[in-house]
Design a protein with these regions (language model features):
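Active-site diphosphate/adenylate-binding microenvironment
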Residues: 1, 121-185
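Conserved beta-strand termini and adjacent loop/short-helix elements that scaffold enzyme active sites
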Residues: 11, 94-95, 161, 185
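Short, exposed beta-strand "edge-strand" segments with a Pro/Gly-rich flavor and a Y/T-containing core
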Residues: 5, 88-95, 132-139
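Glycine-rich, acidic loop regions that bind phosphate or pyrophosphate groups
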Residues: 14-119
């Protein structure tokens, strides 16, 4: 990812994989995602999916609209999850993602992708989840999560339960240190 300067998105279970300020991190996808992450998926010409079953929470209910113009490559150990009648997969590689990444780690892809990378980062900067213009007389979950993100220490762990707090935290928690972790039920 870093070697090839590839824009990346994550699912809600991958929230803590990238630091918020990582140059290649665009956002989160799905109904618990953000605009930038979803725009990146919907405008991609190639989606490389690593270890995800592409569930409804990631793709939405209209499977044929997910990555509608993209070639979709899935690398996953569980082939049965991808034999369901859901998202169109153009190429499936049935292997462990860790093994796959070890094999391709030093491969360099052809350039240029600068325009695409800039477009993705523009979406990320233009449409953050936390807008900062909430009524200060009431508690707002997005404002709370943003403040919590700013106050978390380097080795902090955040756990959210189900319901609205899960949606808001999964969507708006900012990971600012590599050792921060996020778990949900």
């Amino acid at each position: 990812i870093g070697t090839n300067n590839l824009p990346c998105v994550v699912t809600y279970l991958g929230v803590d994989y990238f630091k918020q300020d990582d140059i290649n991190y665009v956002g989160r996808i799905g109904i618990k995602g953000d605009r930038a992450g979803n725009f990146a998926i919907q405008n991609s010409d190639l989606i490389i999916c690593l270890g995800s079953r592409l569930s409804i929470t990631q793709t939405g209910f209209e499977y044929d609209l997910f990555g509608r113009e993209a070639t979709i490559l899935v690398i996953d150990i569980d082939k049965d999850e991808h034999q369901k009648n859901t998202v169109r997969i153009d190429e499936f590689i049935n292997t462990d993602v860790g093994f796959f990444l070890q094999k391709i780690i030093n491969k360099v892809l052809p350039k240029p992708r600068d325009l695409w990378h800039s477009k993705c980062l523009n979406w990320k900067n233009k449409w953050p989840v936390y807008q900062g213009d909430y009524d200060s007389n009431n508690v707002n979950m997005y404002e709370f999560t943003n403040t919590l993100s700013e106050l978390l220490g380097e080795n902090s762990t955040v756990v959210s339960d189900a319901g609205s707090n899960f949606y808001v935290v999964a969507q708006s928690l900012l990971i600012n240190h590599f050792n921060q972790r996020y778990f949900t039920s």
